Structure formats: C-alpha cells, structure tokens
Amino acid sequence: MKIQAAFLLISLVLLPALSSHADTVQTTANGIKYPIGLKNWRVISSSFRTDNNTQRVILGNSLAINASRSGKTNPWPNGAILAKLVWKNSQHPQWNKAIVPGEFVHSEIMIRDSSKYTSTGGWGFARWIGETQQPYGEKKSFAQECFACHKHAKDSHFVFTKPATIP
C-alpha cells in the first residue's frame, strides 16, 4: 500500500511537468492542433529564404520521415505531417562567417489528408506566430493564402521541401 501511495504522489508531482507544449498552444481557425511531440521529430531538410532573411528546419512525423527516406513523396502518404520551424538569420557572435538561428519567427504545419483538404491539394495548412505560438489567421480560409504559393509546387505534390540526402 505504501508503494502505491508513493507512486501516486510521485505521479501527481511529475504529471504537470510531462504535459506537452502542444497542450498549451491554441488550435488554428481551421481546426488544426499543434502536433504533440513535434520537438522529438526528425529532420527531413532545411532551407534558407533570401527574400526575408530566414532559415528553416523541416521536421516530419514518422510517416513523413519514412516517405522522405524511401523516395515516396509524390504523392506524400495520407497522415504525413511536415513541420517547418522558421528563424531570422543571425550572424554568429564569435564567427562572422557563420549564420545561425536568431529570433524565432513561426512554425508552419502541413498535414496530408487527401479527402479532408480537397480545396488545398490534399494538405491542411497551419501556422503559429512567435515563441508564444499564437495561431495565424482569424478565419478558416487563411489556408488559401498558404495554398496560393504551394500551388506553384504542383509537380512535387505542393511541397517545396526537397528531402536532404543523409548518407
């Protein structure tokens, strides 16, 4: 009985610490929730944008990782989730030739569901702004903004990311 009571007490103390960041982030206007466990996802690729001086790391859930490693990304499988974490570029303070992540800008999520997201090429789009992860877009239709750019990547299944080769 003492062991059960001790276990219960320890569980009650640790449970709040185990809560996910995703539990505290608001759902977007189109109903997409911040993915649980995203901080533990694996890298698919990275990219830089010269037009807005930002860098990105693209992560994937297990379905996306398996598809990217096996070359099965056109089309991406239903259930694949891509997460893009975006930072402003910053010069490394001790090495001026190096660019490192600076201020965090936003997170973007693409969820592959060919039946649910028919108006956006089979992808659900979501974005959360800043370190406080405030949902972007007040109306459900904000995803059309995302798709307006992504439709130019039709030949690669509406995804700009090219999976990086990992030897």
Residue ranges and their predicted role:
Residues L18-A22:
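Sec/Tat signal peptide C-region and signal peptidase I cleavage site
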Residues F7-P16:
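Bacterial N-terminal signal peptides
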Residues T54-A67:
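Short, structured beta-strand/loop micro-motifs enriched in basic residues and often containing a Trp
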Residues M1-A6:
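Positively charged n-region of N-terminal signal peptides that target proteins for export
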